[in-house]
Amino acid sequence: MPAMVPGWNHGNITRSKAEELLSRAGKDGSFLVRASESIPRAYALCVLFRNCVYTYRILPNEDDKFTVQASEGVPMRFFTKLDQLIEFYKKENMGLVTHLQFPVPLEEEDAIDEPEEDTESVMSPPELPPRNIPVSGGPCEAKDLPLPTENPRAPEVTRLSLSETLFQRLQSMDTSGLPEEHLKAIQDYLSTQLMLDSDFLKTGSSNLPHLKKLTSLLCKELHGEVIRTLPSLESLQRLFDQQLSPGLRPRPQVPGEANPITMVAKLSQLTSLLSSIEDKVKALLHEGSESTNRRSLIPPVTFEVKSESLGIPQKMHLKVDVESGKLIIKKSRDGSEDKFYSHKKILQLIKSQKFLNKLVILVETEKEKILRKEYVFSDSKKREGFCQLLQQMKNKHSEQSEPDMITIFIGTWNMGNAPPPKKITSWFLSKGQGKTRDDSADYIPHDIYVIGTQEDPLGEKEWLEILRHSLQEVTSMTFKTVAIHTLWNIRIVVLAKPEHENRISHICTDNVKTGIANTLGNKGAVGVSFMFNGTSLGFVNSHLTSGSEKKLRRNQNYMNILRFLALGDKKLSPFNITHRFTHLFWLGDLNYRVELPTWEAEAIIQKIKQQQYSDLLAHDQLLLERKEQEVFLHFEEEEITFAPTYRFERLTRDKYAYTKQKATGMKYNLPSWCDRVLWKSYPLVHVVCQSYGSTSDIMTSDHSPVFATFEAGVTSQFVSKNGPGAVDSQGQIEFLACYATLKTKSQTKFYLELHSSCLESFVKSQEGENEEGDEGELVVRFGETLPKLKPIISDPEYLLDQHILISIKSSDSDESYGEGCIALRLETTESQLPIYTPLTHHGEMTGHFRGEIKLQTSEGKMREKLYDFVKTERDESSGMKCLKNLTSHDPMRQWEPAGRVPACGISSLNEIINPNYIGMGPFGQPLHGKSTLSPDQQLTAWSYDQLPKDSSLGPGRGEGPPTPPSQPPLSPKKFSSSTANRGSCPRVQETRPGDLGKVEALPQEDLPLTKPEMFENPLYGSVSPFPKLVPRKEQESPKMMRKEPPPCPDPGVSSPSIMLPKAQEVENVKGTSKQAPVPVFGPTPRIRSFTCSSSAEGRMPSGDKSQGKPKAPASSQAPVPVKRPVKPSRSEMSQQTTPIPAPRPPLPVKSPAVLQLQHSKGRDYRDNTELPHHGKHRQEESLLGRTAMQ
């Protein structure tokens, strides 16, 4: 019982919470006992001495006696109870660092108001889920009724008492629906015939003739209906049966006696027939669709677009035929085909980020020339629908046997204990408010559907049938059930395409109760995890505590779920679910509210009507708690652009019901975004949120369903190319000069555990050396003692997709003090590269891990992934939007997570390009001095947290720290492009400016590109194929940190390092301190260099919030070395005044076929907001033979 638990026994509190409580106590000898995190049934005794916490493990033996784990040679003492152990060690000099003196009591605030947690459900009977309790009384009910006791010894009185009891029960029932003759027959049976049947039983007979007579009378009409219905059903069955069964031929119906046995047989036959008919119709329809319609599940879709020819906009039509794998270009919708391109000839889709309806398509002609075609769609949704259809086409006709990308639908809905409407297909089509899918994508089925419900009144089979039927209606496909798991009325269902059935394995389900006293299942979470080929996926559906004032309780709910939900690989015991999965999706009714005074309810309603969501999101509890790193640490959420999903009046979406009369008074439920979808993925893996919104036409609940769809990168079950039995010993992973910084007061030694699926088993290191850090932190250095890791497969296609999980553990208790993740997708092999990951434990930030890594792989290269097919070019307008992936309100901009780092070039293998990674600089460091945002919008990296004090190494692979605002690059290196991610805000992608000659293609619309790497803005990097010269000062001190943020030039003002296209203009650059706007010369190629930040002079102070406007550099500043202009192509020779020869740089490793497409002039829309079809620039279709590029 709780009352008997000693005050010093804190149960399952975390280690960090124990340290906090002891530090708060502040007295030497303060102590508490908590459950061990590493050994079941064991405890940890925590003692404070000289501001350090010492932890002793209390172990049970086979006889359930307790002992404190001691060093070798120290005698062990056993105690039958914990109380006896504590009393013993209160004596001095018993072996502890100090004797136990001051027990730290339990915090009782949670227990005081815990029963009120679900008051709303308890006090609102209509909202309770219905129960299928039989109306007829059972034995328990009969015992509750008083029995007459006048003469208990008379047997006939006993029979009369039973009769009277049943009569009373019949009278208490609602019999208004019974026919009068049926009711009279039942009463007659109870009055006389019940006793006669009783006499039959006493004689040993098993028959109840009078009861049979009663049921025959009641079923008389039913018998006639069955006799009349059966022939019709048999005829219908034969109609759909392909092979006639002799047993089902029509036979003459002989009127039989309406007795119960006959009725049961007939009803059984009727039930069997109905089931058989349904199965046969389903089979017939399925076979018919397979043979006739299956190949046209996705019909051809035509898009009306605009294209320019000689500056004149022309209307065009793009027809996408997914099934035949063709993109058809027509001048009129119903006209003949002008030309078409097969899926193999469509090389790249490049989305403009400045103009969200503009798209560039790179296609290959029959003469092996690369053609760049630019189109403007009617809106951004049409462009997204077109891209999804093209991606589906590439995927459908891919020569790869296994997918490297899947799409996932996530849906969450609090059903309000009401059955759903008949039609819920808008939910699965992502239709309604917010970021929704275009109609053209309706026919594209997702690979996996995950549906989470709360307050779900239906049974599992009933709900599953509704879901499968709705998806069948939407996709014409029957989905396989992967898992279904229910806790109380919290449920999660996972469905997958039939073709993925053999790719899904290791399915695991679990639940955690967080309701009253953490025992009742009125609140909590359910989860499902599984492997999709080589990728681990996890899904959590939670229903957290309600009530605006119970924010801290919700935070605790989240922590409990995080800690105790057992999903995924059991070998990863040191890690919770945030590190066990490549992709983790968290959905549900999280119940976080808009925290505003109740008297502002009507003002909130008006802001919702005016769609001023950002004003309300500034007070959203979940966003504020995430900003403070209290919950969902390192999770991401798409920008919210839909109305609050709670609390509506039922059967309408036009009115919020924000008041509710309770027994305790008026309760306010201000409109809030209670229903959310968040996710967390390993570093350097592809994940893009394609839609996030709520439906508008499903109104049976006071919540609206919420949908989110994702592209997620997956890996295959890789088989080594060395063949069976071959020894793959070329690969090696080496960690060097690693150290961890921990936020702890514990006095103990630490070691590392390294886990990965690319290792045969986990690896344990030697103990590190402890040092005193800043602000009470502890620094643990591992130096050169870490073991070298031997991967099971060293092929780069496999190894570079892997991750290493790191856990730093105490040598005394084997408890983890922090966990992190390092990606092996390195820029180059055979070199030491910096690495970084934040360390977390039970959802709290506990420190950082830094060091260097050296990766050795076998020969090979990375193949192109499907998600590389769609890229996004960046321009300056995107900088102002890219902090909107959390919300659009200003308070969040200081905390916005950056995108994932791109996959970078591998000098000896192949270039790895992925547009959805964290911004990384040279050798994994942030791109210092090459900021893409203004100072107040500096993107942080993976960890989302404050800039660590020691940034000498810079972030490396994995969850990096915030990008320092200004540090010189080591050497020029190519930039990779960014892809569309989170709507208008892609993940920032910055790659190392290291190897000479590797440069990014210009994103100018007419300009042919090197593969899909699109950068047009000098803020983001060089777009010339020529190397960038680095100032001597930067070469001499590549790792010097500077506090000043880099300047962010105005669109019309060139940076000191912007190269002009002509020689005389270059001289002007050297002689001026304030640069004039860059002139745009017709078709003349415009050459750009990297934006330089070689010194701190002329830089704005770190606190400047000038939104990227630069200060003029000092006049004494040395001129920046300038790259030579590009030699124009032959098609442009006639338009240039003075050709300037220049030596060609080394060819990039990847896609040399389109290198020279960088040499033509494109349009520049940075200085105006005019759309491309307004006729200011020339047509940008240029052809260039591949042979000319060698």
Curated annotation (Swiss-Prot):
Q: Short name of one Pfam family for this protein?
A: C2_SHIP1-2_2nd
Phosphotyrosine modification sites are Y917, Y944, Y1020
Motif (SH3-binding 1) on chain: 126-131
Q: Give me any GO biological process, just one.
A: negative regulation of osteoclast differentiation
Gene3D superfamilies under this entry? Endonuclease/exonuclease/phosphatase, SH2 domain
Phosphothreonine found at: T963
How does it get modified after it is made? Tyrosine phosphorylated by the members of the SRC family after exposure to a diverse array of extracellular stimuli such as cytokines, growth factors, antibodies, chemokines, integrin ligands and hypertonic and oxidative stress. Phosphorylated upon IgG receptor FCGR2B-binding.
Q: Where is this motif: SH3-binding 3?
A: 1038-1049
Q: Which residues form the SH2 domain?
A: 8-104
CDD domains, alphabetically? INPP5c_SHIP1-INPP5D, SH2_SHIP
| Keyword Aminoacyl-tRNA synthetase set for record | no
Entry keywords, A to Z: Apoptosis, Cell membrane, Cytoplasm, Cytoskeleton, Hydrolase, Immunity, Lipid metabolism, Membrane, Phosphoprotein, Repeat, SH2 domain, SH3-binding
Q: Which reaction does it catalyse?
A: a 1,2-diacyl-sn-glycero-3-phospho-(1D-myo-inositol-3,4,5-trisphosphate) + H2O = a 1,2-diacyl-sn-glycero-3-phospho-(1D-myo-inositol-3,4-bisphosphate) + phosphate; 1D-myo-inositol 1,3,4,5-tetrakisphosphate + H2O = 1D-myo-inositol 1,3,4-trisphosphate + phosphate; a 1,2-diacyl-sn-glycero-3-phospho-(1D-myo-inositol-4,5-bisphosphate) + H2O = a 1,2-diacyl-sn-glycero-3-phospho-(1D-myo-inositol 4-phosphate) + phosphate
Q: Report the GO terms under cellular component.
A: actin filament; cortical cytoskeleton; cytoplasm; cytosol; membrane raft; plasma membrane
Region annotation (Disordered) ranges: 111-130, 946-1190
- Residues with the Phosphoserine modification: S245, S934, S966, S971
Motif NPXY motif 1, residue numbers: 914-917
Bias kind Basic and acidic residues: ranges? 989-998, 1031-1045, 1161-1183
List the subcellular locations. Answer: Cytoplasm; Cell membrane; Membrane raft; Cytoplasm, Cytoskeleton
Query: What does the record say about its membrane topology?
Result: Peripheral membrane protein
| Compositional bias per record (Pro residues), positions renumbered to this chain | 961-971, 1140-1149
The record's family statement is:
Belongs to the inositol 1,4,5-trisphosphate 5-phosphatase family.
Relay the domain remarks.
Answer: The SH2 domain interacts with tyrosine phosphorylated forms of proteins such as SHC1 or PTPN11/SHP-2. It competes with that of GRB2 for binding to phosphorylated SHC1 to inhibit the Ras pathway. It is also required for tyrosine phosphorylation.
Name of the protein described by the UniProt record: Phosphatidylinositol 3,4,5-trisphosphate 5-phosphatase 1
What is the organism field in this record? Rattus norvegicus
Gene responsible for this protein: Inpp5d
